[in-house]
Amino acid sequence: PPPPPPSPRQYLDDHLQGLFLAHGMTVVFVTHSMAEAVYLADRVVMLAPQGGGLVLDQRVDLPRPRDQDTRGSPGYAAHIHDLATALARWAPGGVVA
């Protein structure tokens, strides 16, 4: 069977990526979604909840342009794991939602 169509959020992520690639724009994008951050970013910066100190500054070296198949790649999964590990150090009780 064909893959399901992208969700509205995934559609918007693809549209935003198309805009900044087509126009050579730099975008500062704030999100609470690790999946969205890894999909869109060339660099992810994670700030601590108290005081805003730097928790993580990581390059995302996935090739561009990215498509929804990127979300199933080993490199994508590795970046998500790194973010979740960093977040777990700062989440109350080490629990990541």
Give, region by region, the residue ranges found by the protein language model:
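ABC-family P-loop ATPase nucleotide-binding domain
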Residues: 92-97
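Conserved catalytic segment of ABC-fold P-loop ATPases
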Residues: 39-46
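C-terminal alpha-helix
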Residues: 82, 86-90
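Helical segment within the ABC ATPase nucleotide-binding domain
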Residues: 9-24
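The feature captures the ABC ATPase H-loop/switch
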Residues: 16, 32-35
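Conserved beta-strand-loop-alpha-helix hinge in the C-terminal portion
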Residues: 47-82
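Short loop immediately C-terminal to the Walker-B catalytic DE motif
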Residues: 1-2
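Conserved H-loop
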Residues: 24-30
